[in-house]
Amino acid sequence: MPDFALPVMAKVVPAGPDWFHEIKYDGYRLQVIRQGEVVRLKSKGGRDYTTRYPWIVETARKIRQDHFVIDGEAVVLGVDGVSDFDALHSGRHNDEVQLYAFDMLAGDGEDMRKLPLAMRKMNLARLLRRRPEGIFAAPFEQGEIGPDLFRKACEFGLEGIVSKHRERTYHAGRCIHWVKVKNRAHPAFSRVQDQFPAS
């Protein structure tokens, strides 16, 4: 089972042409693992959250491909489309939790971690091309727009952005080609990250 790639913190957003930039949603990191009819949700800390977030599980079962691993962030979205960490953390909205999917680590029995990110993103888009509710592919921008995107994220009160090099493979642990730049005014900046509620 794949472990998690983790971004390094930075103060400056990469601006080269080979970088993808994603808005950082404020949620819990999860991998969705499907093997036939069996779906599991694995947290970054190794916990099993399969029974906690039924919408994600039901959606994963509806996807036509029946063997895959996707990486993403479990979120509760407000009416404005912005992730609401307090609603997620409270546990009162577990039936509404969706997955913001940003990577695909395996599909149809093939390990995709050695593929470049750009190709993994293409595979993820194909997997989710029917736009199943409950799991959605993370939008991203490419290239020089990164610093401008970060400024806009801060203006809208979002957590920040994560920038990833399009040609790099997926490695467990801290990755210098995944760079997180956080909005210092956002509550998540001072909060201990990815702390799941007690089971």
Regions found by a protein language model. Name each.
Residues 1-199:
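Catalytic cores of nucleic-acid ligases and guanylyltransferases
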